[in-house]
Amino acid sequence: MGKTVASLGQGTRPDPVRSFNRWKKKHSHRQHQKKERRKQLKKPEWQVEREGISRLMQNYEKINVNEITRFSDFPLSKKTLKGLQEAQYRLVTEIQKQTIGLALQGKDVLGAAKTGSGKTLAFLVPVLEALYRLQWTSTDGLGVLIISPTRELAYQTFEVLRKVGKNHDFSAGLIIGGKDLKHEAERINNINILVCTPGRLLQHMDETICFHATNLQMLVLDEADRILDMGFADTMNAIIENLPKKRQTLLFSATQTKSVKDLARLSLKDPEYVWVHEKAKYSTPATLEQNYIICELHQKISVLFSFLRSHLKKKSIVFFSSCKEVQYLYRVFCRLRPGISILALHGRQQQMRRMEVYNEFVRKRAAVLFATDIAARGLDFPAVNWVLQFDCPEDANTYIHRAGRTARYKEDGEALLILLPSEEQGMVQQLLQKKVPVKEIKINPEKLIDVQKKLESFLAQDQDLKERAQRCFVSYIRSVYLMKDKEVFNVSKLPITEYALSLGLAVAPRIRFLQKLEKQPSTELVKNPVTEAVPPRAPSLPNDEADESPAYVSEKMSVLHKSGERLEETEHRLASGDGDEEQDEETEDEETEDHLGKAREPHTESVVSIEEAQKVKEVSVQFLNRDDDDEDGPDADFLTVKRRDVFGLDLKENEALSKKEPSKSSVKKKLTKVAEAKKVMKRSFKVNKKITFTDEGELVQQWPQIQKCAIKDVEEEDDTGGINLDKAKERLQEEDKFDKEEYRKKIKAKHRERRLKEREARREANKRQAKARDEEEAFLDWSDEDDGGFDPSTLPDPDKHRSSEESESEDTNHKMSDTKKKQETRKRNNTEDDDVRPRSRHGKKAKWETVEPLDTGLSLAEDEELVLHLLKSQN
């Protein structure tokens, strides 16, 4: 019974395989139902992304600056964090820690920090996050505008943006001068983030169709103090007018501005000021060792060469004050071969060449870069060991930016400043006021290498290099003369002659503006050059950065008015009531003192009223010295002095002037290029001529020959410019008469020479003919080869004339064959003689004299018989 129950119990147990299959079927059904429900409940990607953005925005208010050490501590998008991690950016700097949070909250920020502290990422991260929050696409147009003062800085910012933002879907573009404008215009409308320079951006705003910035969300000014100064004033004002008022603005620089006027121009709303190192002991990095040396002007080149020879395995940057200095010294040092690679970077180079130099210097481990101030701001050259300032900077801020190219991101670096004895006191005092620790060091005279003799030999061999040395000399003197701080820069204390010799020049070139200054009377203009008369202003833009801003020259020209007689003429017209407004178009008048220079006198548009003319006197002195180069553009230099008559002391004088009418003599006559050329011709300058001789001392004909004028130009000056066509036609007619007479003489001489040759040929032919007649011999009969002459016995006997026909026929046949041979020989000789004989002018052969009869020594009957025999043989 028990066994039966057990068997029944075992029979009721379910089959495990069958149970597993049923469970699997149910489980699969449940999973399928869950999957279907998830599909129905799944949100679109854009909605999920929007929810993530909202969570990030909620965390912006919770940012605690003291707790942030990495970028991941900020509430940033995954795409931005991934780009930072791939670009090896993990830890944040002080400026990034304090500004990124404020920028993410949508506030306007003015950030200032030491050089090399990471200001570029401080504004690039908020830029990416701002467009990500708005889910910006390429169809939305321009969203962020980043403006840099130089092309190199804009290029560097664009490269960092490409690395950090490569995971985003935004489109970015680089718009700088030196590239194809049409190529940029075709793509600029689809750009979301635009990195540019002010000049090229304004050009696109004026010329590119359908380009606008109405949807702009953020404006970033890198190196804002430089962009907002007078160099870019007009350009930036025009750009800001085209931008919407409602936007976020970020300003970053190592030396920030607090000018209320500049901030009002940008329409900033309650900006946040972030000065990271405002309370620091020094305004430069702590790892930067800074020194200066005192050196005479004529020893600076030797000091530079000795410095390079002693630092062959270092990476250095040498700063100069002008482009022409860089051009000349770069070529000279390449010939001196100091043993290290030398590169040159300045504003007169083509854009592609500038980018090549920039990338090449970044790649090299040991090299020297000769540069102007375009490389002084923002550029991040890795592992720069030395920064040598060959020329004194214009102020302490410029020094800070130059020295900031080394000791970046807590790395070590050294800076050396070369000062003249006249510059030491003023410059060192300014640096100490800016909290820049500098100390003086001495030069080791044993390591100083003098290169003046080598430079002299280079200039003696190369005329082009000599001209560059002259332009370098004038450019340096001009840059010192135009510096606004006359306590530091005094051109009268410079040893000009010794400096010219140190460049390799035998004689110091002429400096026109100094000569003009010496000729002027001792007025207040000379006593107080610029310091007291000109109001303080922002640092001027260097010459090589002027190409970035078309408004650079116009801004400086806007403070100029007419000088000398032109000022008096203006006062006369205003006082006499000619009009309340006067507009003078820009004119280019060449200087009459030097016709080889290209000096222009620009005049700006000015609106002056009578009352203002009575209160204000402006005296402008303009000194120009332009040098044309294959790479250089024209430099415009201006010096402006203003004197205001606040108390109206000159009212009486102006009233007296108002009663007088402007005389014709006071009006300066405009000089055109044609008039200048005529004056040069009247002075009858003797042009140098190059004469080449062979080794034997014979003169080599120069080709092409210089055309000579038979009629001297004695035309008087015309009132109207240009060329008088009537007088030119008359002159050409006179020249044609002379040319025709010369041509007729040449043809006549050519014919005479040909006739003489023909006459000489006829004489030679006559001589040969006479000689041939003298040598001619007469043969009456021909004998065998053994006989040497004529044998009379061979003649037929008249008595035996009718001999046997057989013997006679044989003799006749023999003689006929010999006669034909002789005749062919004579015909051949006659043909050759006929070729030699000259022909008469009418094409007929010349007649010869009658040949006298030969005396054969035979009787008349024998001669007749001989003739008959010969005639019969010919027939």
From Swiss-Prot:
SS bond partners: none
Record domain Helicase ATP-binding: where: 100-274
One matching Pfam family: Helicase_C
Compositionally biased intervals (Acidic residues): 578-593, 775-789
Positions of ATP binding: Y89, R90, L91, Q96, A113, K114, T115, G116, S117, G118, K119, T120
Residues that bear N6-acetyllysine: K556
Keywords per UniProt: Acetylation, ATP-binding, Cytoplasm, Helicase, Hydrolase, Isopeptide bond, Nucleotide-binding, Nucleus, Phosphoprotein, RNA-binding, Ubl conjugation
Compositional bias ranges of the Basic and acidic residues kind: 562-575, 594-604, 734-744, 755-774, 797-831
EC number: 3.6.4.13
Disordered: annotated span: 1-44, 525-612, 734-860
Cross-link annotation Glycyl lysine isopeptide (Lys-Gly) (interchain with G-Cter in SUMO2), location: K652
Location relative to the cell: Cytoplasm; Nucleus; Nucleus, Nucleolus
Domain characteristics, as noted in the entry: The Q motif is unique to and characteristic of the DEAD box family of RNA helicases and controls ATP binding and hydrolysis.
Designated name of the protein: Probable ATP-dependent RNA helicase DDX10
Organism: Mus musculus (Mouse)
Top-level taxonomy: Eukaryota, Metazoa, Chordata, Craniata, Vertebrata
Name of the gene: Ddx10
